[in-house]
C-alpha cells in the first residue's frame, strides 16, 4: 500500500473556543461609536450619589453600578428585569457596566423600589440639564401632547361611581326599613345617621346583647326556622357591609373621575384608539400620559387619571416651571388643550400659546360656513346686537357665571323673543325661543389663537408638533413596543414612565451626537 501525503495547507489561526486570551478589557472590544459611551458621557456628569438613600444591613451591590445598568437597559428599551439580568451575563456592554457583578432580577427590583422610586423625577431633571447644556437645546419652544396608555389591570375589573351611588341610596333605604323593624321588635331606638357605619355597627352589637339577655335562640344551618329578630339582625349586618363597600368605592373614585379598576385603583376606565373587540368603543383601564418636547428631547412628564387633556395643562405647566424655574416662551398643543382656563393661564404667565380650540379645523370647512344658524355665523351690529338670518334681533337676557372654571368666567345669554312667528324656526331651534350663549373674552382669546395658528410661524410650529410630540409617542409605542404599563399604582407608574423617558432622551442624545459627527 502506497503512502499518501496530504499537501492541503491551512492558513487559519488555531481556534480553540475555550482558550483564555488576554487582555480581558471589555472596553477594547466595544465599538467606539456604541451608545454606551454616549450614555456614560451623560451619566458621569451627574452626581448620582446624592440620590442614594442610606440603609442598614449588609452591603449590597454598588448603587451607582445598579443605577447605570438600569438606565442603560431602558435606553436600549429593555424593560423586563429578567431580561436585564440576562443581559448582564451575555451582553459585553452590560458586563462592562456591571464590572464582573451578576445582579439578579430581584436585586434590580429592590433597587428600583428602594432607591429610584421617589428620586426618578430629580434624576430625570439632572439628566436633562446636562443634555440641554451639551446640545444647546432651545427650551423656549415647547410641544405638548398626551395619550392614554393601558394600565396593568384586568379589563373587566371596572367600578362605576354612578352605580355605587345608586346602590348606596338603595342600601340606605333598606337599612332604614330594617332598623325600623328592629326598633319595633326590641324597643331599641337608633338616633344616629344611617350613613354612619360605625354607629350602625354599635346598634348591631346592642341588638345582639338584647337577644342574649332575652334568651333569643339563633338558628344555624338550613332547615331551621329563624325568628324575625334574627332575620332582621342578619339583614342589617349584610346591609352595613354593603354600605361600607359603596362608600369606599365612591371615596376611591373621588371628585374628578367616575370609575376605577379593582386591580389598580389609580387606573381609570377610558376610551382608547384600540380595544379588544375590533374598535367597538369598549372601555379599558389606563392612565393619561402627558409629554413635552423641545428639540426632540422630552422635557417634562406627567401621569394622571384624567380622561381628557384639557384639565391637565395647568398642572403640567406648573410642574415644568417647578422643574426648570421658568416657563417656556411658546407652547404648541392640539385641540384637546384649547379652553378658557388654559388661554387665561397662558395670558397670565406671559406664554404665547399656539393652542387649537375645539372647532378650529371645522370652521374652515364649507359645511360650517354655509350653516347660517350657527351662532358664529350670526350677523352682529355695531352696537353688539345679534341678528338672526330672518332679520330678527336678539335681546340681552342675563349673565351666567361658570363656577367650574379656575378663572372667573361670565357668559352672556341672548334671546330672540319673536321665534314663534318665524317660518324657519324648525331649522333654527327646537326650543320655544332661540338662546345664544356668548363669552366675549373667550371669543377674543380664540381669535388671537387663530391668528397665531394661521400665521407662517404657527403653521411651521404645528408641523413640528406633529413630528416631535406625536413622533415621540410613535417611537415609544410602536418602535420600542411599549404600549402597556407594566406596574400598578400611581407612584410606580410615574417611576416607570420617568425611566422610559430618561432612556428615550439618552438614546436621542446619542443619535443627535452621531449625526453631528458623521455630518
Q: Where would I find each of the regions flagged by the language model?
A:
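A ubiquitous short alpha-helical element
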Residues: 8, 53-57, 457-460
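Secretory-pathway/luminal and periplasmic proteins that interact with or process carbohydrate-rich
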Residues: 94-99
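Hydrophobic alpha-helical membrane-insertion signals
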Residues: 1-36
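Anion-binding and metal-coordination hotspots
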Residues: 3, 70, 77-90, 101-102, ...
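Generic, well-ordered alpha-helical segments
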Residues: 31, 57-65, 76, 80, ...
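Short, solvent-exposed coil/turn linker segments
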Residues: 25, 29, 38, 43-47, ...
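Basic, short loop/linker segments at the boundary and entry of helix-turn-helix/winged-helix-like folds
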Residues: 29-71
